[in-house]
């Protein structure tokens, strides 16, 4: 819903880059490297890339510039107004400037041969392989791609829980449009395969807890296949699906009760509260959350039935009586 009036004048955009972004501790404390490294992170919104960021920074001894367009949104001088005017849709109004700052920060960091951690969705494998990765390699960077394998019901919960928790804690959250979430989720496996075909960089896949599940240097599978299999495997773990079902129930409760507790949101006033309820209804958030709850409940119940049948089959080795799950 952004329009041209939301985009900063060129001079102000560049001033903020010089005076705020390029003077941040993350940038100025990172030193030039003889053999700089770039770790490109991929995953749909809510997948849990934050854990991979921390892991990558630790591997690089905290000596790296982290590039995350979402973190750069806060530098927009009108961001507080946007959050008040559009509690759900404000991030779109900062998108153009934040994306440009991310590109400009990358250019500045690579010019000084600083290590990079690039937090992205990796939804465009062609651009990533032919422009981003190739450009970094031409500048002497050792490049690696790391992706998070998170099933859609998990990442969707991550997006929604982040929004509600931050709204309760600080008065605002960052929502990601449903269409964007759906598109990115579907594109990631294809993007990984495109990168694998068009470049020689290692591709590694991790789960949300940071455990490595795949390394293209040692696994004959295509990364897209490995990602899909890892996503699906997560939903076959009954302990995981039970936990996710309980987590989604909390989200259902939050959205159902929003009209009753909206006045408790910090740093808000009646105008902001009314706008939050208006956008919440317009985007049919409660319906979306309810559908996710229904999805994980079905998977969780099926998983329980499979476990029951498996136990029965095992017992049948000793006794022939087994009651099918009702």
Residue spans for each PLM region:
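Conserved nucleotide-sensing/catalytic segment adjacent to the nucleotide-binding pocket
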Residues: 61-137
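Conserved phosphate-donor/acceptor-positioning beta-strand/loop module used by diverse small-molecule
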Residues: 137-159
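Walker A (P-loop) phosphate-binding loop of P-loop NTPases
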Residues: 45-46
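Non-Sec secretion/translocation targeting segments of pathogen effectors
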Residues: 1-3, 296, 301-326
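Hydrophobic positions on the alpha1 helix immediately C-terminal to the Walker A/P-loop
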Residues: 52
